[in-house]
Amino acid sequence: MSQVNMRDMLKAGVHFGHQTRYWNPKMGKYIFGARNKIHIINLEKTLPMFNDALSFVEKLAAGKNKILFVGTKRSAGKIVREEAARCGSPFVDHRWLGGMLTNYKTIRASIKRLRELETQSQDGTFAKLTKKEALMRSRDLEKLDRSLGGIKDMGGLPDALFVIDVDHERIAITEANKLGIPVIGVVDTNSSPEGVDYIIPGNDDAIRAIQLYMGAMADAVIRGRSNAGGATEEFVEEAPAAESAEG
């Protein structure tokens, strides 16, 4: 069973919320008090909620389900990318494109284009083109990879979303809600918990806190997969077959 403890959360600064004047009253029940006009999150509430979310993710991973990691703001992107890669999960770290879930058919066409360009860049096609055309395709490849590289092997809609900063990723949450995809989210004192199925009340800005959330989630995925007897790389290997089955 994947678990975090109080000490880890305190060390990472999970308890530091936002300035009191920016608070969202819907988060009131998770606030312990205030210090120097900063809300302090009640970690006695966060701890069981965080561990419930980890157990949920572990169970999903044990059933070979896909958890999409989402964190596009500057402080989160790099950590999201690294931890998703470590556990072989899909991720969005740059920008959420509207319709990434609700208009997946269009997204799938863009992923197909990304794969074609990747092949062309490796099989010598680019070298046979004019300098201008090769440059244009290289730029297209770079742009598509930045936006869709993290989900190109997803092979269909995810079974859950894990989101850092629910306000920043509100479009992703709305899309998941429309499709009935469960959402796990880190919710700070200035954010609304609406649309989040598994709320983790906590600091969504501090790099150490983000590292704790992402590391624990990646560990839960790895543990779930190993319990199911599946390899971490399974997601990457199975994806092309799943994608063709979708089409």
From Swiss-Prot:
Example GO molecular function: structural constituent of ribosome
Record-linked InterPro entries: Ribosomal_uS2, Ribosomal_uS2_bac/mit/plastid, Ribosomal_uS2_CS, Ribosomal_uS2_flav_dom_sf
GO biological process: translation
Pfam annotation, one family: Ribosomal_S2
GO annotations of cellular component type: cytosolic small ribosomal subunit
TM ranges: none
Domain of life: Bacteria
Keywords recorded for this protein, A-Z: Ribonucleoprotein, Ribosomal protein
Signal peptide: none
Keyword rRNA processing among record annotations: no
Keyword Ribonucleoprotein included in the entry's annotation: yes
Family (UniProt): Belongs to the universal ribosomal protein uS2 family.
UniProt cross-references to HAMAP family, sorted A to Z: Ribosomal_uS2_B
Protein's recorded name: Small ribosomal subunit protein uS2
Source organism of the structure: Ectopseudomonas mendocina (strain ymp)
Gene transcribed to yield this protein: rpsB
